[in-house]
């Protein structure tokens, strides 16, 4: 599989080939993904919750994102690597936003993703002008869950729906190459997808987007809580627990290590 580029990503919208994206946070996972046909890896700030054990993504730092982006990039996957910009790494001013986006690219990402709507237009323009591809993110934006009143579906009111449409158009105009739409009503995501010339990637927003993204821990059945919009394709949590328990039994009953697991001196 050859390296997926921004141009390939955008082309998939015109050819109506669905885009596939998953999160990854470490070298072993990225190495496994590199041997699949997945289109894109998101080094998501969701690592704060599924890797670092925080209650939300607000505690994730640039240092965290750089470290995990480097780990993923070391696997040299052909997939397009997109790295999340963490909370307060791009909101303060455009100068720091460009600097932090550049640090993620230097760490190995092919593009960055940031949350927010029309209020992020100038920031997006500045980062794109600096030569860094930007993916947008609207709908439920986890870094803004306090302002949104919690983790909820966005677009219930006419005002919210109109704002989502406006946000998507403003972000496209600002230069984003793709847009994540999270936890909105399916008809809204469909309208946005039809209006935009750039590909949309859904998570919890229905089947009419140009692609889908999931947190890999949800897909693998590793999460303590799986959102309603995620699907677990295997229960790795159970498989891992069973393996650990079998190891404990084998050690306690002197069934491990076996002869092939150690060396004896020759007599």
From Swiss-Prot:
Pathway: Cofactor biosynthesis; coenzyme A biosynthesis
Keyword terms: Coenzyme A biosynthesis, Cytoplasm, Magnesium, Metal-binding, Transferase
This protein's record includes keyword Transferase: yes
The protein's role, per its UniProt record: Catalyzes the reversible reaction in which hydroxymethyl group from 5,10-methylenetetrahydrofolate is transferred onto alpha-ketoisovalerate to form ketopantoate.
UniProt-annotated location(s): Cytoplasm
Cofactor note: Binds 1 Mg(2+) ion per subunit.
Name of the protein described by the UniProt record: 3-methyl-2-oxobutanoate hydroxymethyltransferase
Cofactor(s) of this protein: Mg(2+)
Xref: SUPFAM superfamilies: Phosphoenolpyruvate/pyruvate domain
Catalysed reaction, written as an equation: 3-methyl-2-oxobutanoate + (6R)-5,10-methylene-5,6,7,8-tetrahydrofolate + H2O = 2-dehydropantoate + (6S)-5,6,7,8-tetrahydrofolate
């Amino acid at each position: 599989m050859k390296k997926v580029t921004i141009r390939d990503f955008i082309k998939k919208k015109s050819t109506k080939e669905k885009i596939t994206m998953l999160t990854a946070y470490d070298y072993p996972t990225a190495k496994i993904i590199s041997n699949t046909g997945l289109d894109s890896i998101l080094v998501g700030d969701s690592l704060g919750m599924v890797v670092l054990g925080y209650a939300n993504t607000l505690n994730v730092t640039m240092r965290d994102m750089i470290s995990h982006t480097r780990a993923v990039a070391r696997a040299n996957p052909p997939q397009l690597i997109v790295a999340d910009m963490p909370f307060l790494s791009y909101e303060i001013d455009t100068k720091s936003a460009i600097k932090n986006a550049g640090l993620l690219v230097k760490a190995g990402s092919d593009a960055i993703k940031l949350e927010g709507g029309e209020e992020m237009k100038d920031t997006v323009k500045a980062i794109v002008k600096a030569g860094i591809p930007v993916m947008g993110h609207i709908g439920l934006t986890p870094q803004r869950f306090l302002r949104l009143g919690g983790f909820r579906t966005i677009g219930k009111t006419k005002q919210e729906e109109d704002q989502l449409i406006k946000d998507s158009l403003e972000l496209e105009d600002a230069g984003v190459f793709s847009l994540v739409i999270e936890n909105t009503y399916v008809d809204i995501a469909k309208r946005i997808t039809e209006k935009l010339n750039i590909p949309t990637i859904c998570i919890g927003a229905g089947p009419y987007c140009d692609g889908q993204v999931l947190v890999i821990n949800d897909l693998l059945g590793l999460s303590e809580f799986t959102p309603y919009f995620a699907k677990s394709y295997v229960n790795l949590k159970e498989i891992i627990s069973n393996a650990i328990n079998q190891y404990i039994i084998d050690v306690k009953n002197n069934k491990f290590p076996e002869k092939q697991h150690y060396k004896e001196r020759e007599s």
